[in-house]
Structure formats: structure tokens, C-alpha cells
């Protein structure tokens, strides 16, 4: 699949309509810091959050909620007519959606899949909302501490992998 690279000045239809379309049928991987952020917002322990709302020992958010019109399961944190029940504690993947972030040569790059902006298919109403620069979007999503946590976690995982060989 084609990947479109972006820069912080890229202007995109990033104002969220809060329709919840992105909360269905996804795979959201979590790092330990995100698991902790979720549990704090839910006011339960990390272990309780992991056991109730995650799969594979806490590394993947469970999508076992009510299905949408396409038959895709809702995120375990999604509430009809409200949205994310733990919005302030949401992980980096949700903060960046529909964008992705990849690290190459120790530099972060923001991307989206395909040559057409992903939200336009299921959330065409975003075209009627104000467009934002990628930099403005990231600031509004408060992504920075989550990016730092993700970067540090990736270093730890790489070090573990290096030790194995």
C-alpha cells in the first residue's frame, strides 16, 4: 500500500467530527505507559485494566463492544452517543489517528496510508470543518509525552532484542 509522508506544516482535514467511526474494527497496541494512562483515567489498577480491557497480556486493546453498521466491533472503551470513555488517557495510536508515526534514522516521520486521506471515506463531514496543520493537530492531541514514552519503550525493546542475539 502507498504511504504518504507528511510534515508539520501539512494542512489536512484533521478537525475531528467525534462521530466515533475510528473506534471500530481497529488494532491498537499498547505500551506499559499507555496501559497506566488508561488505568488512571478509569480509576482502576493497571492490572485490572489489563485483565478487563486488553488481550495478549496487556499489549493490545480489546475491541469487543457493540458492532457498527459494517459489523466491526467497538473499542472496549467506546460508549454510544458519548465516544471514548477514557479520552484523556487514550494511547498514542488514538491521538494520531488517522495518521501513523514511524522512526527512520532516529527521526520521526508522520504518514497516512494511501494517496487519499483516510477519514474522507467514513467521515466526509470533516471537509466542512476547519483544516489544521499537522503541527497544530499534534499539539491539540497532546501527543508529545506519549511519543516520548513510545520512543523510550522502543529503545528498551530494541535493547532486549539485541541481547537475544
Predicted regions and their residues:
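Short loop/turn segments that flank or connect secondary-structure elements
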Residues: 1-165
Amino acid at each position: 500500500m502507498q504511504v504518504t509522508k507528511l510534515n508539520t506544516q501539512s494542512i489536512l482535514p484533521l478537525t475531528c467530527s467525534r462521530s466515533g467511526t475510528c473506534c471500530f474494527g481497529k488494532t491498537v497496541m499498547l505500551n506499559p505507559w499507555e496501559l497506566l494512562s488508561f488505568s488512571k483515567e478509569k480509576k482502576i489498577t493497571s492490572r485490572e485494566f489489563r485483565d478487563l480491557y486488553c488481550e495478549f497480556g496487556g499489549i493490545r486493546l480489546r475491541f469487543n463492544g457493540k458492532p457498527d453498521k459494517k459489523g466491526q466491533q467497538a473499542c472496549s472503551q467506546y460508549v454510544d452517543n458519548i465516544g471514548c470513555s477514557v479520552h484523556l488517557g487514550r494511547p498514542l495510536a488514538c491521538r494520531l489517528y488517522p495518521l501513523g508515526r514511524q522512526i527512520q534514522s532516529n527521526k520521526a516521520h508522520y504518514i497516512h496510508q494511501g494517496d487519499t486521506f483516510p477519514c474522507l471515506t467514513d467521515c466526509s463531514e470533516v471537509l466542512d470543518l476547519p483544516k489544521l496543520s499537522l503541527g497544530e493537530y499534534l499539539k491539540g492531541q497532546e501527543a508529545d509525552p506519549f511519543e516520548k514514552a513510545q520512543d523510550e519503550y522502543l529503545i528498551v525493546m530494541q535493547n532486549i532484542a539485541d541481547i537475544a542475539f
